[in-house]
């Protein structure tokens, strides 16, 4: 397998990733700003499929109409010249001080109206550029103090904002779907819709939830101490994995945004295994872009930025190679059988069986030997050892 990425791999990068200048809460920028046109050309040279952006990554918040027109003209020309796509667009409702208490859930109604208008205008741009997904990350939607929010009203306002945007997409006939991006905290002390599970529960309450799904991020779920592969699996199972953000994270701490696979490597392996191979017993598969949302080390110049971009794609392709070999290994297939993974794919009730039939089946309870069943060895360690051996290239 070649480690040279091609557009067929569908690797995408946020403009805010390779364009991150290194400024953080404790220090100023360590790199100059990156021209979006240069980012398009460089990512194309590296074999990427697409580039994504927040509205203000591309067009400054205070740009004039003529400045905006020129920026978009140059950006579109670069896309046309390189063939790079813009599969996803999102809106910045977190950087400007006006959003210090949120966008959709600010206690200031005028700010909420401004935020919603900003989102609707950005939806128009996303559709114009041929995007398929419109991500919403509510980084400022939350609080530090529980008494500062009517939590029911905040969720009502979040629902109102998302439903209004979704209805606008439908009214305009745009081929867009909305993907909510969960995160537990940072920059707010507590962010609304902190995990995949919260996101799924929220979507179930929406009027236009049919076009609203999720954009889980590796580090965001792991910041909450959760299993990222389990999270995306449930989103996929629910038909709501609309987009995915891949990066690296080491434990419960601030959002590290490392190169994919440079954090929890075993978790990264099983993430790629799920994305590429699907569930062992079949079921829905993810067919969207493999999007990298990371930060190049602020200790590097732009030579290091482009090396880190290549590293994300190389790590994914290496893990894909290992994951394909893992599933194709006869020993692994036998271990999956021994561990009961295939048996888990069998319905507990027989076809057409009722609860009355189950209760009448003596073998299911009265004659069931719990002590004997408890002696079964599932050999999960053996199965995991095989996975690690494939991950390390030992098989």
From Swiss-Prot:
Protein residues bound to Mg(2+) 1: 181, 217, 245, 293
UniProt record, GO biological process: D-xylose metabolic process
MF (Gene Ontology): magnesium ion binding; xylose isomerase activity
Cofactor-binding details, from the entry: Binds 2 magnesium ions per subunit.
Subcellular location field: Cytoplasm
InterPro entries according to UniProt: Xyl_isomerase-like_sf, Xyl_isomerase-like_TIM-brl, XylA_actinobac, Xylose_isomerase
Location of the active site: 54, 57
Catalysed reactions, as listed in the record: alpha-D-xylose = alpha-D-xylulofuranose
Domain of life (superkingdom): Bacteria
Any Pfam family: AP_endonuc_2
E.C. code: 5.3.1.5
Residues engaged in binding Mg(2+) 2: 217, 220, 255, 257
Enzyme class of the recorded protein, top EC level: isomerase
Reported cofactor(s): Mg(2+)
Keywords noted in UniProt: Carbohydrate metabolism, Cytoplasm, Isomerase, Magnesium, Metal-binding, Xylose metabolism
GO CC terms in record: cytoplasm
Family as reported in the entry's similarity comment: Belongs to the xylose isomerase family.
Subunit and interaction comment: Homotetramer.
Protein name stated in the entry: Xylose isomerase
Organism: Arthrobacter sp. (strain FB24)
């Amino acid at each position: 397998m070649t480690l040279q990425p091609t557009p067929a791999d569908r690797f995408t990068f946020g403009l805010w990733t390779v364009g991150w200048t290194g400024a953080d809460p404790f220090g100023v920028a360590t790199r100059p700003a990156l021209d979006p046109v240069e980012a398009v050309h460089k990512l194309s040279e590296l074999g990427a499929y697409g580039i994504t952006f927040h509205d203000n990554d591309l067009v400054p918040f205070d740009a004039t109409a003529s400045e905006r027109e020129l920026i978009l003209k140059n950006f579109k020309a670069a896309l046309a010249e390189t063939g790079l796509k813009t599969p996803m667009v999102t809106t910045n409702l977190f950087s400007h001080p006006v959003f210090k208490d949120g966008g959709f859930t600010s206690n200031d109604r005028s700010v909420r109206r401004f935020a919603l208008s900003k989102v609707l205008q950005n939806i128009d741009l996303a559709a114009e550029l041929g995007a398929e997904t419109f991500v919403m990350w509510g980084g400022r939607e939350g609080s530090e103090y529980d008494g500062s929010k009517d939590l029911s009203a905040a969720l009502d306002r979040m629902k109102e904002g998302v439903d209004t945007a979704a209805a606008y997409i439908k009214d305009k006939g745009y081929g867009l779907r909305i993907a909510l991006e969960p995160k537990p905290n940072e920059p707010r002390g507590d962010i609304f819709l902190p995990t995949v599970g919260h996101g799924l529960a929220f979507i179930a309450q929406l009027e236009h939830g049919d076009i609203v799904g999720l954009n889980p991020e590796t580090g965001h779920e792991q910041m909450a101490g959760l299993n990222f592969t389990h999270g995306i699996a449930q989103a996929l199972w629910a038909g709501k994995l609309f987009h995915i953000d891949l990066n690296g994270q080491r434990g419960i701490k601030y959002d590290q945004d490392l190169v994919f696979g440079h954090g929890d490597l075993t978790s990264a392996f099983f993430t790629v295994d799920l994305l590429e191979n699907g569930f062992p017993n079949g079921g829905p598969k993810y067919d969207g872009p493999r999007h990298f949302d990371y930060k190049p080390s602020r200790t590097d110049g732009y030579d290091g930025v482009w090396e880190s971009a290549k590293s994300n794609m190389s790590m994914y392709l290496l893990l894909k190679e290992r994951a394909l070999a893992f599933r194709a290994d006869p020993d692994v297939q036998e271990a999956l059988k021994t561990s009961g993974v295939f048996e888990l794919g069998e319905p507990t009730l027989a076809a057409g069986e009722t609860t009355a039939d189950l209760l009448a089946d003596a073998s299911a309870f009265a004659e069931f030997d719990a002590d004997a069943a408890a002696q079964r060895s599932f050999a999960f360690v053996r199965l995991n050892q095989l996975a690690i051996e494939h991950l390390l290239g030992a098989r």
